Every structure is written in C-alpha cells, then in structure tokens.
Amino acid sequence: MASLKEIIDELGKQAKEQNKIASRILKIKGIKRIVVQLNAVPQDGKIRYSLTIHSQNNFRKQIGITPQDAEDLKLIAEFLEKYSDFLNEYVKFTPRNNNAIQEEEIDMEQQEEKEEKPREKGKKKSVEEEF
C-alpha cells in the first residue's frame, strides 16, 4: 500500500509527463458507497491537486447523498482531519459555479423547530384537554 505522499508524487509526475489530468481513487477503509478521488491537473507548468467524491458505481456522475451515507461521510471527514496538514500543502480546489444555481443557507436548528411544530398541531387532543 502506497502512502498518500507517494500517491501525490506519482500522480503529479504522471500529469506533468502526459500533460493531462491524472486521477486516482483512494480506498478509505470502511466506506461503502462513496469514493474519494485525488486529481492532479497540469496548469501553467505546475500541478494543481483536488479531491472530489463520487458514487462507487459511477465515477463520472454527480453524487446524490442520503441519510444512509452518513457513516461514509463521517469516515471521509476523519480522513480529511487526519491528513489535513499534508493535504493543505497540495490540494487546492476552487468551486466553479457556472450554472447560476441559487444557493440558500439552512439553519439546522431552526429547521428542526419548524418540523416539530406541525407535529404538535396534528396531535389529537383528548376530551380533558379540549375542555
């Protein structure tokens, strides 16, 4: 098994020699449905690195996530935290949003409160509670 440093060096060398994007899927122990892909992109004589996540079944497609993916995402977060100092040296990713997609921030605590209120309204009251 190669170290992350060896993988990054090998990808960088491959991308520079071939002058095209070189990618490698990183198999993180315990992840079931989601894979992490490390990309080396040649750009103006230098190599730019990025990390992306994909469905294990189809690496080229955008991934939709479900609550069942929580454990996989937790393991990815642990991987990112463990190697953060090292990854920060290499991985630079600037999200591009060319599609004019509207973005909204969601406050999870407020959302939970809103979801609880309708449940209380829908609760049937007993005769004692009514009078």
From Swiss-Prot:
It comes from the Viruses. Residues 99-131 are annotated as: Disordered. InterPro entries: PHA01746-like_dom. This is Uncharacterized protein 131. Residues 102-113 have a biased composition (Acidic residues). Residues 114-131 have a biased composition (Basic and acidic residues). Pfam families: PHA01746. Coiled coil: none annotated.
